[in-house]
Swiss-Prot record:
This is Maturase K. PANTHER family: MATURASE K. GO terms for cellular component: chloroplast. Keywords: Chloroplast, mRNA processing, Plastid, RNA-binding, tRNA processing. Coiled coil: none annotated. The lineage of its organism: Eukaryota, Viridiplantae, Streptophyta, Embryophyta, Tracheophyta. It comes from Taxus baccata. InterPro entries: Domain_X (IPR024937), Maturase_MatK (IPR002866), Maturase_MatK_N (IPR024942). Its main location: plastid.
Amino acid sequence: MDEFQRYGNKHKSWQQCFLYPLFFREDLYTIAHDLYLDKSSSSEPTELSISNFFSFPTVKRLIRRIRQQNDSNSIGLFRNCDPNRFINRNRNSYSELVLEGLTVILEVSLAMQSKHFIEGMDGWKSIRSIHCIFTLMEDKFPYSNYVSDIRVPYSIHPEILVRTFRRWIRDAPSLHLLRSILHEWRNSFSAENLQKALVPPRENRRFSLFLWNSYVYECESFLVSLLKQFYHSRSLLYGSFPDRTHFDKKIKHIIIFPVKISTKRIWLLKYPFIYYVRYGERSLIALKGTHLQVKRCRYHLFNFWQYYFHLWSQPYRVCILELSKIYFYFLGHFLSFKMKTLVVRTKMLDDLLISDIIANEFNPIAPIRSILLYLTKERFCDISGQPISRLSWTNLSDDDILDRFDRMCRNLFHYYSGSINKDSLYHIKYILLLSCAKTLACKHKSTIRLVREEPGSELFTKSFSKEREFIYSSFSKTRSQRERIWNSDILQINPLANSYTINK
């Protein structure tokens, strides 16, 4: 990728967004070939030469065929492509590789377009943790009284995306090629494919993610101007950089924080009376105002999606929640805001003033029942919560079994480090520890007691060891339940964060 950026700095065609000549560079498809093999299974041969598959005439013929086909054509070059059929050297695998090359061109080109804007700004700071969302919500959301829970609409016409790309792609051949491919992918934003794109990244195509990120970037860029008009503010500044993955920047009254974790993005936007958070297709807008103002904001959002993107958004995709009366599910946590009274004593000379301050307290709750159902689904325990052996892991070595259980317990405790029901997580730790012991006992055809007491056994000396007790120090029962620690090394979310159906 760096090589192509250096190449783009030397050639005016890339800098001026004339991308069509770049489609025929063989080194570009070498990168696409590597990306393609990364998505394939490990059992496939990797020693295949790129020269046996790519050449200028072949790519040119394929692109010409893409441009000449119409919607009634049954060729379907980019439809129902199986990424695991590379060895067959058929038309679908070839088209998939060409699509990977096209995606690389678009990503690098868009990155170079915003590079000059980023270099002109100072004070950027890298923050990679997903828990920065919860720290912002803990600090700022209690001052709001309403939250709009928004699901970004995913039904979009290909011509809307073509209009978006036309702003930074200047040559007509590239736009015609994109239009042909997008019409082949016109079902990519259906409900089923969207869930596949957001939940299991290994089954997702790179091009589909690029389309989704471009579409959401377009939505959010207009959302800022919409909020600016709604609050009659002229001091609101906005800068968006879809190619940057880790940074945090304050611009007067606004904070923008995009983070790419796996295949998703996180955006934080701060305004004196508005706080905006997004992960994937789920967005939260916290407002301080009356119920009428919140309904007006939702009305403007509906009009924006209807008139700009030419789509109708279902009313249930924008829910208005009153923070003091309801809790909601976001990123694997149940979030609630409860009223609390703070007693403030002020000493002024001989007078002692006592006043009560009523404020909202941020209470994130770990969904213990949902975690138990997840462990049941993964065969760590039965439906009643009793630990069972993980039979599929009995063919692994003892070290691998211990490391897997230890890693899962550590990640789970890290992710829910800021929840208020920390004591309930010890039950989850007990299930994982006993399931690990039963798995080792099943492997060695022994009992749990013998596995634990066997000389040289590393069940309680390596896994969950004292050397790693600092991992769970924030969950010590001697600590106050009011103390909340958010770990700053969370780079991927808990699997429950992608689940929208929660068992309460």
